[in-house]
UniProtKB/Swiss-Prot annotation:
GO terms (BP aspect): positive regulation of transcription by RNA polymerase II; regulation of transcription by RNA polymerase II; transcription elongation by RNA polymerase II
Taxonomic path: Eukaryota, Metazoa, Chordata, Craniata, Vertebrata
GO molecular function: DNA binding; zinc ion binding
SMART domains recorded: TFS2M, TFS2N, ZnF_C2C2
Domain TFIIS central intervals: 138-254
Zn finger region (TFIIS-type): 257-297
Tissue specificity: Testis specific.
Compositionally biased residues, Polar residues: 95-109
CDD domains with a match to the protein in the record: TFIIS_I, Zn-ribbon_TFIIS
Protein name: Transcription elongation factor A protein 2
Organism: Rattus norvegicus
Domain of life: Eukaryota
Gene symbol of the encoding locus: Tcea2
Binding site residues for Zn(2+): 261, 264, 289, 292
InterPro entries in the record: TF_IIS-typ, TFIIS/CRSP70_N_sub, TFIIS/LEDGF_dom_sf, TFIIS_cen_dom, TFIIS_cen_dom_sf, TFIIS_N, TFSII, Znf_TFIIS
Length: 299
């Protein structure tokens, strides 16, 4: 069994432990990983970092948590080294001198695009295309804030992705869609940052880091589309309830004294029956107290 297959096997076992909420034997697997020489290529291809990070978040064993943190920290160094090399390559192209500018007559000193980076023996963390460098202070600040949002909870280390590069991609897509850095642009960036940092919606951030949601998609998504699954279900339920209440109010209902309001104890009520489930299931009865406005329902 090759090294990549072995690491992938460990990752799958860790994922099962997280799903079953049973970490028995996890320490042995983490020790195996600690003794393996992990490269950026292996980190990205096996996604073992995400498995270790998920286990760390779920576990209450201090020794296991410490070992998982140690592994993630060591893998983060690989990420930092690659980011540093990428930045050095970006800065490696010297600015032209005044004499060379005079000779060419078309050189832009402020925003000259760097030459394509030379191929390196160190594999790239992401497959996202390069983005143009910007000299706009507002855009650069937005890229920095998006980077911090993507780095929330260190999921980027587990995935093995360059947050600086990915945030630049997202900002570039937002800028191209809006066309300027006015209030609409700033509000768009602010909403991305808020949703990416949301502790109740880690799935959005992980999907962006993994590439399941592309920079082009996250740049134009609405608040409803970025919401967590839990919030989407709540909104869906509220919409259904509002529709039912509207239907009940429109039909007027039937006045009766068969029901007693649990608030004012009066029997002056109006009820409406609505088929909310399949036709062979009992109808849902909605009751409104005509005295105090209290509402309730039952099947």
């Amino acid at each position: 069994m090759g090294k990549e297959e072995e690491i992938a096997r460990i990752a799958r076992r860790l994922d099962k432990m997280v799903t079953r909420k049973n970490a028995e034997g996890a320490m042995d697997l983490l020790r195996e990983l600690k003794n393996m020489p992990i490269t950026l290529h292996l980190l990205q291809s096996t996604r073992v970092g995400m498995s270790v990070n998920a286990l760390r978040k779920q576990s209450s064993d201090e020794e296991l948590i410490a070992l998982a943190k140690s592994l993630i920290k060591s893998w983060k160094k690989l990420l930092d080294v690659s980011d540093g090399k990428s930045r050095d390559q970006g800065r490696g192209t010297p600015l032209p001198t005044s004499s060379s500018k005079d000779a060419s007559g078309t050189t832009d000193l402020s925003c000259k695009k760097p030459d394509p980076p030379r191929t390196s023996s160190t594999p790239r963390i992401t497959t996202f295309p390069q983005v143009p460098i910007t000299c706009d202070a507002v855009r650069n600040k937005c890229r920095e804030m998006l980077t911090l949002a993507l780095q929330t909870d260190h999921d980027h280390v587990a995935v093995g992705v360059s947050c600086e590069h990915l945030s630049s991609q997202i900002e570039e897509c937002i800028f191209l869609d809006v066309g300027n850095t006015d209030m609409k642009y700033k509000n768009r960036v602010r909403s991305r940052i808020s949703n990416l940092k949301d502790a109740k919606n880690p799935g959005l951030r992980r999907n962006v880091l993994c590439g399941a949601i592309t920079p082009q998609q996250i740049a134009v998504m609405t608040s409803e589309e970025m919401a967590s699954d839990e919030l989407k279900e709540i909104r869906k339920a509220m919409t259904k309830e509002a529709i039912r209440e509207h239907q009940m109010a429109r039909t007027g209902g039937t006045q009766t004294d068969l029901f007693t309001c649990n608030k004012c104890r009066k029997k002056n009520c109006t009820y409406t029956q609505v088929q909310t489930r399949s036709s062979d299931e009992p109808m849902t009865t909605y009751v409104v107290c005509n005295e105090c406005g209290n509402r309730w329902k039952f099947c």
